[in-house]
Amino acid sequence: MLRQSDFSLFFVIDPPALLLDSVILVSTARYHLPDVELVAYCPDAKREFVPAFLKELYSSLNVDLRFLPPASFSPHYKQGNKILAACQSRKPAQSIFLDTDIAIGRNFDLNDMAKPGHVGVVPEGIFTWGKPQSLWSRVYAMFDMDVPDERVTLSRSNLQSIPYFNAGVVSFPSNSSFAEMWMETANAIDGNDEIRHRRPWLDQIALPLAITRSGKSAHVMEPGFNLSLSRNLDKPHLAARDVLKMNATDGRVIHYHDPVYIEGTRYAADIDKAISTFTKYPGAAALTQQTRDRRAEAARVWRVFESLKKKKRTEEEDVLFREARQRKSEIKASRINTVAGLSRYPATILPSG
């Protein structure tokens, strides 16, 4: 039986991306799992773009910030950072990779994610890749492996599938060869043009094969260890149905995808409590308000631009169109200007006093 301190929870930031997501993750993790090791990995090329407020928060919560060497994927494959992070050395006996858009839902025994001789995973929600199932035959043939007879139930569609797992939560023994085999398998598949549409799903395609090739078996965990909160908010009746299902699940590891999906679930109050304990913000909504405002403005600008682009415009409409076009260009430029993006953040987010 492992102690909480025998586990390392690790994740990736990619400035300016995933910074506020990581605030939610480390706040909820430290709130519920006070003795676990927390490690944030950042590409070394982005070292100078880790903002001071985040370094300060990490220090206050005993989060170890480490830097990743360049990945071997060409062209760049951002999901490859998780595999590269998995390959790094960590002292605790068990490593658990978490996508950064995750919150810890409650205190629980991490041994539930650490079955000896296994890699802990949760099935993907839907057929993001692998439909038709015959696509897997070519992948397994690359490694002279038979397609397994085993089937898993996809967590959202409830359809049966050849083992296909969400790579947002992966638990494995730190001293095993699994991570290196994951990298080797992913690189091999990435270089095979016969495997169509392999990106961005490469990490998940390689995952079940890497488990087997490393001499491990998959510990197929229940959905509560990677509970997706995403839903179609434009269809309230369907969203309400999904929330009922989410609320009925014992969500220990909450894969919220976007903070807006936290709202309206039974997990919101607890996540907000963790955030308010370690930061000056009362919850996820306040923490991410500026991001939401920028997203709302962009949506409005794009709507105006698209509605006027192809029509015969009046003088007044032409003024609106030119203003929207200019603002659209400014928004697009700001998205790729890392320095400008980081300047929006406060100097500190720690609680005052």
Residue spans of the language-model regions?
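Glycosyltransferase catalytic domains, chiefly GT-A lineage
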Residues: 1-353
